[in-house]
C-alpha cells in the first residue's frame, strides 16, 4: 500500500512537470534580431537571436523559403541567474530522457549539458555508497527520482547549499549527503556528469561561445552559407510543428575590403569585397563631386573610371548597394587619390638661378615647389620650365643663393606641395596631410668662403632626396645654364662652321667633275647630314 501511494505521488509529480514543459513548449518562437559575419570566400555566417525551444517542437529554420538542414542551436540563460554559466533556465526537459538519444536533437546538447549540473548531489553519492542504495532501489525508476528534486529545488538550491540535503525524498539518505555534499560540488559532480553521456565533447564549448549573447538572455541559432551567390535579402523564419512561427527580414551588409586607387591623372578605381545589390542594375558611383563611371560590377569587385585629381577625404557614394560599410563597420566611406611619389630631386644649393628637377609620379600641372631655409624663410621655385605628371623642372629665384652659412652643417627642407590649398602651411602640418611631401636635404659644411665659391663654380653640392650618388658635373652644368652653356655653344659653332665650309668646297669640287644630275644628288645628301649634326635650336638661340 505504501509503495502504491509512493508511485501515485511520483506519477503526479512527473505529470505536473510534463504539463509545465508542454506549457513552455506551447510558447511561440520570437526572433529579436539577425546579425551576420563575413568570412568570405570561405563562408558567410548568419546569427539569429531570440527565444526558441528545440525540444518536442520540431524547430525548423528557413531562409528565402529554403529549409536549413545544418544549423547550430545555443540555449540562452535567464537574466537573474547569478551563478555559473552552466545553469540554464529549463531543466525540466530532462524528464523525457528518450528524447536526448534522438540524433535529431544533437544540436541541443547545450541545454542537456546545463540540465546535468542542477541535478541534486544525492545521485552521485548514491552510487558509491552501499547503505542508501537500498532505499533508491525501492523507488524502481532511478532516472525519474533525480528529476523530482530539480522541480522543487532548482530555484532554491542556488542561494544556499544547506537546502540540498533537506530536499531529498527519504530521510535515510540525509546522513550520507550531509557528509559528502560539501566536497562533491567542486570535485565529483563535474567529472561524473561530464563522463556520463557520450555527447559531452559537443556541449563543453557551448557555455563559453555564446557568453556575450547569453548575458542578454537570447537563444542563438547559427548557420553558414558557402556560396556568395546564394546570399540575398529576404525573410528568415523559425517555425514549430504545431504551426507557430516567427519571421524577420534579413538584409546583408556590403563590405568594401580594399580600394585600388588611381593616380593624379585619373584612371580605374577598383573596390574589392562582398557586394549585395538591391536590383539587377549596375551601381552608380560618385567620389566627391565627380562621377566614377561604372565599368564592371560583380559580387566581389566593382570597377569604375575616375578623372584626374588629388588629395584625400572624398566621400564615396554607391547607389544600388545594400548597407555599404568598410572592414571596421563604418558607413562613412572616403577615398584618397594615390599619393605623389618623389623618386629623386636634383639641383645646386648655392648657385643663383639654379634649376630644381623633381622626378616622380602623380604630379599636377599646378604644383609648386618651396625651398625653406633653416631660419624658416621660404623661397618659391616659381619659374616653371616643365610640368608633367612625372617630371617637374623649375628655376629658383635670385634672392635665394645661400642655404647655410659657412663652417656650419644644417639640414634644409625642400617641400614639394601637390595642389596646395594654402602655401603657408607649416612643416608639421605638411608632414601629416596626404598629398604633401617633404624632403630633407643635408648640406656639406664649408670651411672657407673660397671653398664655398669653388662649390658654386664646380657644382659639387647637389641636392638628392634619396641619398643617391651625385650626377656628373658635366651633366649638371648643362642644366644649370650660365657661362658653361656659352662655352658649349662656341664648341658647337666652330666645328659646325668649319664643317659647312669644307662641305661646300667638296660640293663645288664634285660639281666640276661629275655631271649635273649626280652633283644634285650629292648636294641633297650633304644637306641631310648637316641637318642631323647641327643642333638647330642651339644655333638659333645664339644668333638671336
Swiss-Prot record:
Protein origin, superkingdom: Eukaryota
UniProt keyword Signal present: yes
Transmembrane segments: 490-510
Known glycosylation sites: 80, 224, 308, 332, 366, 380, 410, 422, 478
Main location (coarse class): membrane
GO BP terms: hypotonic response
Segments of skewed composition (Low complexity): 126-142, 150-165, 189-199
Cytoplasmic side: 511-544
Extracellular side: 20-489
Polar residues biased stretches: 84-99
Gene Ontology cellular component list: contractile vacuole; membrane
Cellular compartment(s): Membrane
Keywords associated with the record: Glycoprotein, Membrane, Signal, Transmembrane, Transmembrane helix
Record flagged with keyword 4Fe-4S: no
Cystine connections: none
Positions of the UniProt region annotated as Disordered: 84-215, 444-480
First and last residue of the signal peptide: 1-19
Post-translational events: N- and O-glycosylated.
Bilayer topology: Single-pass type I membrane protein
Record protein name field: Glycoprotein gp100
Organism, as annotated: Dictyostelium discoideum
The gene coding this protein: gppA
Amino acid at each position: 500500500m505504501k509503495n502504491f501511494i509512493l508511485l501515485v505521488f511520483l506519477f503526479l509529480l512527473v505529470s505536473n512537470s510534463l504539463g509545465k514543459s508542454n506549457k513552455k513548449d506551447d510558447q511561440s518562437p520570437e526572433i529579436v534580431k539577425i546579425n551576420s559575419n563575413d568570412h568570405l570566400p570561405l563562408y558567410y555566417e548568419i546569427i539569429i537571436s531570440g527565444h526558441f525551444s528545440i525540444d518536442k517542437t520540431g524547430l525548423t529554420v528557413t531562409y528565402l523559403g529554403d529549409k536549413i538542414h545544418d544549423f547550430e542551436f545555443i540555449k540562452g540563460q535567464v537574466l537573474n541567474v547569478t551563478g555559473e554559466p552552466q545553469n540554464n533556465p529549463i531543466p525540466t526537459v530532462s524528464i523525457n530522457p528518450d528524447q536526448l538519444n534522438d540524433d535529431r536533437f544533437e544540436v541541443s546538447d547545450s541545454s542537456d549539458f546545463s540540465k546535468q549540473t542542477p541535478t541534486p548531489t544525492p545521485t552521485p553519492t548514491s552510487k558509491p555508497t552501499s547503505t542508501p542504495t537500498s532505499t533508491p532501489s525501492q523507488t524502481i525508476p532511478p532516472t525519474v527520482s533525480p528529476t523530482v528534486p530539480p522541480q522543487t529545488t532548482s530555484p532554491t538550491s542556488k542561494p544556499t547549499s544547506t537546502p540540498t540535503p533537506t530536499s531529498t525524498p527519504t530521510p535515510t539518505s540525509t546522513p550520507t549527503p550531509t557528509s559528502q555534499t560539501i566536497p562533491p560540488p567542486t570535485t565529483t559532480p563535474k567529472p561524473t556528469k561530464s563522463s556520463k553521456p557520450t555527447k559531452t565533447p559537443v556541449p563543453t564549448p557551448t557555455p563559453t561561445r555564446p557568453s556575450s549573447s547569453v548575458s542578454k538572455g537570447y537563444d542563438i541559432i547559427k548557420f553558414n552559407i558557402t556560396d556568395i551567390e546564394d546570399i540575398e535579402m529576404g525573410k528568415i523564419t523559425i517555425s514549430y510543428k504545431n504551426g507557430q512561427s516567427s519571421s524577420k527580414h534579413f538584409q546583408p551588409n556590403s563590405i568594401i575590403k580594399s580600394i585600388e586607387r588611381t593616380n593624379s591623372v585619373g584612371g580605374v578605381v577598383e573596390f574589392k569585397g562582398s557586394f549585395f545589390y538591391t536590383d539587377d542594375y549596375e551601381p552608380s558611383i560618385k567620389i566627391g563631386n565627380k562621377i566614377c563611371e561604372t565599368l564592371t560590377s560583380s559580387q566581389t569587385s566593382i570597377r569604375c573610371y575616375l578623372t584626374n585629381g588629388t588629395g584625400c577625404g572624398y566621400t564615396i557614394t554607391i547607389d544600388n548597394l545594400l548597407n555599404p560599410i568598410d572592414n571596421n563597420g563604418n558607413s562613412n566611406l572616403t577615398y584618397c587619390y594615390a599619393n605623389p611619389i618623389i623618386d629623386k630631386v636634383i639641383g645646386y644649393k648655392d648657385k643663383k638661378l639654379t634649376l630644381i628637377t623633381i622626378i616622380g609620379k602623380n604630379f599636377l600641372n599646378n604644383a609648386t615647389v618651396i625651398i625653406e631655409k633653416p631660419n624658416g624663410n621660404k623661397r618659391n621655385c616659381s619659374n616653371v620650365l616643365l610640368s608633367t605628371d612625372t617630371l617637374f623642372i623649375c628655376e629658383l629665384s635670385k634672392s635665394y643663393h645661400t642655404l647655410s652659412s659657412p663652417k656650419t652643417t644644417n639640414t634644409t627642407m625642400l617641400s614639394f606641395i601637390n595642389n596646395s590649398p594654402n602655401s603657408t602651411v607649416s612643416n608639421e602640418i605638411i608632414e601629416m596631410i596626404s598629398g604633401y611631401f617633404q624632403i630633407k636635404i643635408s648640406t656639406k659644411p664649408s670651411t672657407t668662403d673660397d671653398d664655398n665659391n669653388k662649390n658654386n663654380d664646380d657644382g659639387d653640392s647637389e641636392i638628392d632626396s634619396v641619398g643617391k650618388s651625385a650626377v656628373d658635373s658635366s651633366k649638371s652644368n648643362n642644366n644649370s645654364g650660365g657661362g658653361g652653356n656659352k662655352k658649349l655653344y662656341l664648341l658647337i659653332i666652330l666645328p659646325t662652321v668649319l664643317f659647312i665650309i669644307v662641305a661646300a668646297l667638296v660640293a663645288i669640287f664634285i660639281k666640276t667633275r661629275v655631271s649635273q644630275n649626280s652633283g644634285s644628288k650629292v648636294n641633297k645628301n650633304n644637306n641631310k647630314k648637316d641637318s642631323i649634326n647641327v643642333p638647330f635650336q642651339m644655333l638659333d638661340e645664339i644668333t638671336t
